[in-house]
UniProtKB/Swiss-Prot annotation:
ATP-binding keyword on record: yes
Any single GO BP term: histidyl-tRNA aminoacylation
Name under which the protein is recorded: Histidine--tRNA ligase
Cellular location(s): Cytoplasm
Keywords noted in UniProt: Aminoacyl-tRNA synthetase, ATP-binding, Cytoplasm, Ligase, Nucleotide-binding, Protein biosynthesis
Source organism of this protein record: Bacteroides fragilis (strain ATCC 25285 / DSM 2151 / CCUG 4856 / JCM 11019 / LMG 10263 / NCTC 9343 / Onslow / VPI 2553 / EN-2)
GO molecular function: ATP binding; histidine-tRNA ligase activity
Length: 454
């Protein structure tokens, strides 16, 4: 009995229609990246585990897909090690490679390995899949695409400004209304300092980053469980829940963080970004959000997140500044900043809001009906001219019944059908049928092309 076919949990197949929609997303993002001078690279699907481990925190390391070595990988493992049942230790013995978790760490590795060939500042983009051994659920997959853009080799805040312009341009092209949220890790560090818990900055940021998901009471509970004092938690409340305009929030922060040099630096950086963007005429809202803390360990400056306003869904884009990601690979002092568009969530938003342009998801424009060998040969001549003019066209491969061929056109939403029988061949023309209106007209090859390209 044949095995029932299936795919791993957290992965998906994509139909031709879905792929047309996904390519619309990728192509839109790619076009905007090119507009801002970014160049494309690709890195391998698998990296050495030594490259990946320790870059995403303890939780991130648990979500790495590890690849088993080829050959007799148990030969070098002692009975004692096997009996210990220490999964992490055993995996290190017979797994040297892993599937990439994101595109940022492989990019840092790429920069270090190719430093002599790269012109800095290096503006790169990358659109590739990543894998995470997460528990699959609605909107969360084990295999998904990221669409990253990063600038490395420059600490200018103009890079942050440009990335926010890219975000605004992309979502304006999609027709999705968004709120661009920004914060700064230096502000969060300053807050940790002034509440007397400077050494707990990671615990604080991980907890408050969950505010939207679990609510304030649960955030406070998690902070207490991490050993943060009740007094510090009380001091934290009015700061992270600060309201008002961006300018009002910045003014308050200057007072609140007056004793923190690091915190004031973060306020200064945020003020520059927000003030510069104000002169750029962004189409979308931008908000300074002090609860934005993005849990990844490597952010050191500005951090960003984008939320769709008309759909209940998580973050659809995120990013931030990292000052020494390449340092772990032996190349210290290279500052960078980047963003990552969540293509899968953008796909869901565009579906829910029905924002895909018709031309983006349309396939074949013209189908030639096949009545037999002579008619097909005649049709192929017109078909070649149509394709040369950029018309997406095909001929039904078999001389099947007319009903079957017309049904094929209907199911595939092909808007025009060309019918070539003996009478049409005698006149050197084709009968062009509009499948929506039912209108038919006898046309030359040139007239057919004109009708479909106007």
């Amino acid at each position: 009995m044949a095995a029932k076919p299936g795919i791993p949990k957290g992965t998906r197949d994509f139909s031709p229609v879905e792929m047309a929609k996904r390519n619309y997303i990728f192509n839109t993002i790619r076009d905007v990246y090119h507009l801002y001078g970014f160049q494309q690279i690709e890195t391998p699907s698998m990296e050495m585990l030594s490259t990946l481990m320790g870059k995403y925190g303890e939780e991130g390391d648990k979500l790495l897909f590890k690849i088993q070595n080829s050959g007799n990988y148990f030969s070098g493992i002692t009975d004692e090690e096997l009996l210990s049942r220490n999964a992490a230790k055993l995996a290190s013995k017979f797994c040297e490679k892993g599937l990439r978790y994101d595109l940022t760490v492989p990019f840092a590795r790429y920069v270090v390995m190719h430093r002599d060939e790269i012109t800095f500042p290096f503006k790169r983009y990358q659109i590739q899949p990543v894998w995470r051994a997460d528990r699959p659920q609605k909107g969360r997959y084990r295999e998904f695409y990221q669409c990253d853009a990063d600038v490395v080799g420059s600490d200018s805040l103009l890079n942050e400004v440009e990335l926010m312009q890219i975000v605004d341009t992309v979502f304006t092209r999609f027709g999705i209304r968004v709120c661009i949220k920004i914060n700064n890790r230096k502000i969060l560090t300053g807050i940790a300092e002034i509440i007397g818990e400077a050494d707990k900055i990671v615990d604080i940021t991980v907890a408050i980053d969950k505010l939207d998901k679990i609510g304030l009471d649960n955030v406070n509970k998690e902070l207490a469980e991490k050993g943060i004092s009740g007094e510090a938690i009380a001091k934290l409340q009015p700061i992270i829940l600060l309201s008002g305009t961006n300018a009002e929030k910045l003014a308050t922060l200057k007072t609140v963080l007056s004793d923190s040099e690091t915190g004031l630096k973060g306020v200064e950086e945020s003020e520059f970004i927000l003030n510069t963007l104000q002169t750029m005429g962004l189409k979308n809202e931008i908000e300074l959000d002090l609860t934005l803390a993005r849990g990844l360990n490597y952010y050191t400056g500005a951090i960003f997140e984008v939320k769709a306003l008309d759909v209940q869904i998580g973050s659809i884009t995120g990013g931030g500044r990292y000052d020494n990601l390449t340092g772990v690979f032996g190349m210290a002092g290279v500052s960078g900043v980047g963003i990552s568009f969540g293509a899968d969530r953008i796909f869901d938003v565009l579906n829910q809001l029905e924002l895909y342009p018709k031309e983006a998801v349309n396939g074949t424009q013209l189908l030639f009906i096949n009545f037999g060998e002579k008619e097909a040969a005649f049709s192929m001549g017109i078909l070649s001219k149509a394709r040369a003019a950029g018309i997406r066209a095909e001929i039904f491969p078999d001389a099947a019944k007319m009903k079957k061929q017309m049904s094929y056109a209907n199911v595939k939403n092909i808007p025009f059908v060309a019918i070539v029988g003996e009478n049409e061949m005698n006149e050197g023309k084709a009968m062009l049928k509009n499948m929506e209106s039912g209108e038919q007209q006898l046309v030359t090859a040139e007239e057919l092309i004109g009708a479909l390209t106007k």
